Amino acid sequence: MTLLAFVAETEIEHQILKARGGALSGDALLRRMADADLFIPSTGEVQTDGSGFSPVLVDQGGAPFVAVFTAMSRQPKDMAPYMMQMNGRQFFRRLPAGYGVMVNPGYDAQILVPPHGMAAFKQDHARPVAGTSDPG
């Protein structure tokens, strides 16, 4: 499969390129993604209350990964007929245990966060930030 060239369109995508070049750690990138808007393809029509949402799952080594994009324009038209926009932090918190995240699938800068990586990230975000009552 030929991967598409990745040219940054959004601030978080510039951060992805920094991480790819080694100027930003994977953990720091995930923290920045938590503050960014993500675009999640859905095979079902998403209602205002979130019902109908059915994310696109990609199998990687027997583990399910939810496909997400960092810009609305990145989703291939034939991947899913619908899309839900959500803040990364909200998405990560709602991601069920046992699921990983595939960011920008099909691009040469795609990112795979395995299920155990998402579990560790979510656990870190469950702890309050020093000096605040905010968990992250």
Indicate where each model-derived feature is located.
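An interfacial alpha-helical scaffold signature
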Residues: 1-136
